[in-house]
Structures are given as C-alpha cells and as structure tokens.
C-alpha cells in the first residue's frame, strides 16, 4: 500500500511557523544575555582576586610562581593602607609564628638543604620520591613502567634470572633468551611457521613432515587400489565355484 498523505491544516501550519520564529529569536537573545552575564561575573571575580594580591606579584609568570611561591603573596590587613588598594584584603589563614619556627639543624637534616642563619622558618619543601631499581622490582614483583631500555625484557638484576618472569600470583613463566642482534631467517623444510620476536627467531614445530608422509601414503594406496582394479578387469568376470559347493540348508 502506498504511504498515507499527511494532511496539513493551513491554520496550524501558519501558527507553527510564527511560533518557531519567535522561539528562535528568544533563544538567540537568551544566549547573548547569558554570555554577557558570564563575562561580567568572570571579570568581577578576577578583579576581586587580583585586588587581594600585591602589585609586585601580579605580573609574575605562572611557572615562576609554581616553582617558588612567595610568602607575602597576599595583602595583609595592616598593609592595605600602605599599598593603597581600594578592595578589601583577604587575609590568608596561617599558623602563628611560634608554630612555624623549627630547629635549623633538624630542618637541614630532614631536607638536606642548608638553611641560612637569619631564616626562622623552613620555606623549602623537598619531596623525596623513593627510587625503584631493578633489584627492588624483582624482589617485590613490581612491574616497571615500559621505557626505551626496559620495554620488552625482564628487568631482573641477576643474569641467570633474566630468562623468567614472575607474575603477581607467583607463577614463574620461562622465556627464551632474546638476542636483538640476531637477524630474521626463513623457515626450513620441516617447519611450518617461523617468526621473530625482538630479532630472536622462534619456530613453531610444523606438521609439514607428517603431512607430506600422509599424502605420500595416500598416493601409494590410491595407486595400489587402481592397479588391483585394472588386474581384476583384465582377468574377466568372476566365475562361481561349482565343485564341492556342498548343499545349502
């Protein structure tokens, strides 16, 4: 059956066109106003944050700030009149001075960085990350992230343990010794597949020898069967034996 024709009411079509135009205009106006309000809010918030920063640090590059953030970055309440800022300064919550004072010798021993005689507080924070070498990775079975020199090989420290991989479950998987300098080679006659991993040739035991032997046996059996058929045809039809046939019951 042909598809039914959609009946359109002229009055409904005209009303829909009118509403569509008005709704599109309202949406465009809403987008413009929303963008203006967002820009005004962002500008006001930026001005408020910048007003709390000292003028000498406002043009500081972000990388320099992240590398060594200054202690007097924000305007204190007592410095508001001296700096001449009109905005209200936001005082940063910091612990009291006696709480921040630490022993210079203890700080130097902890951070391994000499501290000056006049420095009453430790403003340098050193984050020391433990270095994981091959021995630690082998003892704890922690996989090392792949890199240019560690990818594709076992990172065990001992030479005699480089031919195995220990899984987190404790299973030991033997691996062939990889020789990156060894070139590729073609498979031999008795091999089915030969491929290379990291330049070390690995060969899957093929079935070419057994398959060839089976094919030769099948060819011989076919030839012997054909020869026997030819000999039987040349001998003529078979004659039943009538002598001493005996009696049938």
Swiss-Prot record:
Residue stretches of biased makeup (Polar residues): 109-126
Broad class of the protein's primary localization: nucleus
Compositional bias of kind Low complexity: 224-236
GO CC annotation: chromosome passenger complex; chromosome, centromeric region; condensed chromosome; condensed nuclear chromosome; cytoplasm; meiotic spindle midzone; microtubule cytoskeleton; mitotic spindle midzone
Biological source species: Caenorhabditis elegans
Any one biological process term the GO annotation gives: mitotic cleavage furrow ingression
Intracellular or extracellular location(s): Nucleus; Chromosome, Centromere; Cytoplasm, Cytoskeleton, Spindle
Entry keyword set: Cell cycle, Cell division, Centromere, Chromosome, Coiled coil, Cytoplasm, Cytoskeleton, Mitosis, Nucleus
Top-level taxon of the source organism: Eukaryota
Similarity annotation: Belongs to the borealin family. Highly divergent.
Role noted for this protein: Component of the chromosomal passenger complex (CPC), a complex that acts as a key regulator of chromosome segregation and cytokinesis during mitosis. The CPC complex has essential functions at the centromere in ensuring correct chromosome alignment and segregation. In the complex, it may be required to direct the Aurora B/air-2 to centromeric DNA.
Ranges of biased composition (kind: Acidic residues): 73-85
Coiled-coil region(s): 12-48
Protein name: Chromosome segregation and cytokinesis defective protein 1
Known partners and oligomeric status: Component of the CPC complex which consists of icp-1; csc-1; bir-1 and air-2. Within the complex interacts with Aurora B/air-2, bir-1 and icp-1.
């Amino acid at each position: 059956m042909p598809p039914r024709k959609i009946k359109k009411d002229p009055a409904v079509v005209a009303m829909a066109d009118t509403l569509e135009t008005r709704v599109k205009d309202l949406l465009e106006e809403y987008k413009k106003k929303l963008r203006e309000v967002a820009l005004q809010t962002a500008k006001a918030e930026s001005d408020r944050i910048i007003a709390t920063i000292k003028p000498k640090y406002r043009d500081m590059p972000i990388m320099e700030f992240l590398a060594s953030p200054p202690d007097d970055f924000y305007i204190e309440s007592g410095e508001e009149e001296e700096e001449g800022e009109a905005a209200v300064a936001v005082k940063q919550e910091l612990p009291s001075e006696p709480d921040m004072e630490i022993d210079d010798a203890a700080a130097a021993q902890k951070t391994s960085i000499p501290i000056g005689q006049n420095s009453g507080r430790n403003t340098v924070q050193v984050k020391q990350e433990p270095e994981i070498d091959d021995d630690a990775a082998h003892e704890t079975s922690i996989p090392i992230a792949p890199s240019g020199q560690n990818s594709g090989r076992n990172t065990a420290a001992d030479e005699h343990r480089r031919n195995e991989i220990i899984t987190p479950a404790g299973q030991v998987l033997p691996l062939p010794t990889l020789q990156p300098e060894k070139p590729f080679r073609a498979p031999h006659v008795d091999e089915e597949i030969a491929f290379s991993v990291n330049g070390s040739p690995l060969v899957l035991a093929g079935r070419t020898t057994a398959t060839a032997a089976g094919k030769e046996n099948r060819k011989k059996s076919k030839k012997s069967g054909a020869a026997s058929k030819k000999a039987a045809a040349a001998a003529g039809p078979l004659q039943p034996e009538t002598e001493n046939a005996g009696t049938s019951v």
